[in-house]
Structure formats: structure tokens, C-alpha cells
Curated annotation (Swiss-Prot):
NCBIfam families: transcriptional regulator NrdR
Cofactor(s) it depends on: Zn(2+)
UniProt cofactor note: Binds 1 zinc ion.
Name of the protein in its database record: Transcriptional repressor NrdR
Matches recorded under PROSITE patterns: ATP_CONE
GO terms of biological process kind: negative regulation of DNA-templated transcription
Amino acid sequence: MFCPFCRHPDSRVIDSRTSDDGLSIRRRRQCPECGRRFSTTETASLSVIKRSGVVEPFSREKIVLGVRKACQGRPVTDSDLAVLAQKVEETIRSTGASQIEANDIGLAILPELRELDEVAYLRFASVYQAFDSLEDFESAIQQLRVEHRGEPADVQV
């Protein structure tokens, strides 16, 4: 690590701490040449492979933007969306992969969004899973009833 002050090619780590979100490490360093101290932040890179084959860096903001559309008009705050995006990123990073398919991000969003707001979940799932008919919605609603409310599976919508 080059010293940003004197450009010496080496530095000594004085202190390392995990960031609040647990996704990066903050290191306090000291240059052995000039003695000045500086901080660095280290994160593991994560790339997304889109359906078209294009590879781009992972972006929490894109998750928030996509989910915000599904939450429009719902009692979901920006803070809720930020927490959801953080949980999704943690889930993805826990796989240890440096590249992930865009489809896998959507799969990681669905359970978190279902916990946050069921209506927003249905909206997001209808686009993400390409619902084609009312039966697709009925099936998703039925699944929500069974999983979250303990109702029998044969209840009509």
C-alpha cells in the first residue's frame, strides 16, 4: 500500500476494524518512511452477470430502486428499503462468490420483501416471475396465506 503523502511503497497496519454493516474493513496505517497515518477501507468486489452477459459491479442502490417501485404507495420507509438492500447484499456475499447472476439477486430479494410487505412482495414477484394470469396471482396469494397465516391450502381467493 503506497503512502498517500510520500509515496513510500509500504505501510504498517496499526488497527483494523469491521465497518458497522460488516461488509468492509477499515484499517489505520502508518508509513515507516514519513511516519504519517492514514486510513483505508477494504471491501471484496462483487460483480453481477446480467441476462445479456454484461458484467457490472454490484449496486445496493439498484436493489433499492427496483424494490421502491413495488413499494410505491405502501407504508415502507427509505430506511426499511436500505435495511432490505443490506440484508440482500449480506445474503449474496455469504455465498463467497465474486460473481453472481442477476437472477440470484432477485431470488434473494423475494423472501426479504415478503417479510417487509406482502403487497409489495406480490408486485415485485409479478414482474420478476413474469405472472401471466390471475391464476399466477392467486397461487402466490394462496402460498402467502399458507406460509404466514397458517390457513389451509384449499381456501379460495
